[in-house]
From Swiss-Prot:
This is Major urinary protein 11. Keywords: Behavior, Disulfide bond, Pheromone-binding, Secreted, Signal, Transport. One of its GO terms (molecular function) is small molecule binding. It comes from the Eukaryota. One of its GO terms (cellular component) is cytosol. The gene is Mup11. Residues 1-19 form the signal peptide. Belongs to the calycin superfamily. Lipocalin family.
Length: 181
């Protein structure tokens, strides 16, 4: 009987933990909970050169500020070993949970998975000059995340057609942590 009770408790715990995850396109998504400080952990793209050193999309997220119909995103970039700050405003689109921002083309993005307290996974599609590419980012409240979360992110990338060799772990890269206020 004790073993059955223990298994029931374990099962309920797993259900509760799973229920805490949300997607920006789902009904249970609370955008207010993504407000605050974040760190870029991993970037992935079907055009790897966009996220390699000096790539235009090698951006290091510092903060998300939630407004009524938009998000203010504060990033840092590294060019020639120098950190620069970059802020942009992403506006809600007509699609549930989708935002758009103009940066090196027109971008739309969603947040397919987040638990609000530890990680956020974003999926972006860029359109420029008739060409498109996709980018995915794993962001954490702390400067690094567990290997389990990183593996879940890699699997999500594969589900979107991004190969593992196009996934770059930036947890040991210069992410301009010293430039944070």
């Amino acid at each position: 009987m004790k073993m059955l009770l223990l298994l029931l408790c374990l099962g309920l715990t797993l259900v509760c933990v799973h229920a805490e995850e949300a997607s920006s396109t789902g009904r249970n998504f609370n955008v207010e909970k993504i407000n605050g400080e974040w760190h870029t952990i991993i970037l992935a793209s079907d055009k790897r050169e966009k996220i390699e050193d000096n790539g235009n999309f090698r951006l290091f997220l510092e903060q998300i500020h939630v407004l009524e119909n938009s998000l203010v995103l504060k990033f840092h970039t590294v060019r020639d070993e120098e950190c620069s700050e970059l802020s942009m405003v992403a506006d809600k689109t007509e699609k549930a949970g989708e935002y758009s921002v103009t940066y090196d083309g027109f971008n739309t993005f969603t947040i397919p998975k987040t638990d609000y307290d530890n990680f956020l996974m974003a999926h972006l599609i860029n359109e420029k000059d008739g060409e498109t590419f996709q980018l995915m980012g794993l962001y954490g409240r702390e400067p690094d995340l567990s290997s389990d979360i990183k593996e879940r992110f890699a699997q999500l990338c594969e589900e979107h057609g991004i190969l593992r060799e196009n996934i770059i772990d930036l947890s040991n890269a210069n992410r301009c942590l010293q430039a944070r206020e």
